[in-house]
């Protein structure tokens, strides 16, 4: 029986990059938990900013460099940088380290798998048809230049008694090709019938490796 591997972990160092760049044998567990806390804190605080990924880099034990990839940088930066300054100061108090925050704008959110998954989840939570939400996401991604996209939803779809999963695929999705640039994202929609899981794969072409 075939086993599926995470599309990002499969390509680390080739066409994908690490979300955490540091190594510390002594404080590994502490730093790992801190990284997760940082990501949850920023995602929850700026839920409507369209945050896709948060990278954490630690040049030394006293500094944390955070890079936030977002579709709406203005929400995090704020007027004259007031919001990002407030965020930096809050993180410095929370973790007792010097924090540097960099913001990277996502130019085409339609090609970001995490944002696409969260968009579908949001539509389902607002009682939109899951099929319409999936097809619209696929259409937008292909129109913006994706070479392939797969969207899968699983759960009590449409309030059905028995949970099932459905998926749509458009274009190519070479999951076994290492140099293929495949973006992957997941999200959860909370409905009155239970949770619905969403997975999105987007193929953007091949990396030069």
UniProtKB/Swiss-Prot annotation:
Keyword Ribonucleoprotein carried by entry: yes
Gene3D superfamilies: 3.30.300.20, Ribosomal protein S3, C-terminal domain
Free-text function comment from the UniProt entry: Binds the lower part of the 30S subunit head. Binds mRNA in the 70S ribosome, positioning it for translation.
A single GO molecular function term of this UniProt record: mRNA binding
Protein's UniProt name: Small ribosomal subunit protein uS3
HAMAP family: Ribosomal_uS3_B (MF_01309_B)
Keywords of this entry: Ribonucleoprotein, Ribosomal protein, RNA-binding, rRNA-binding
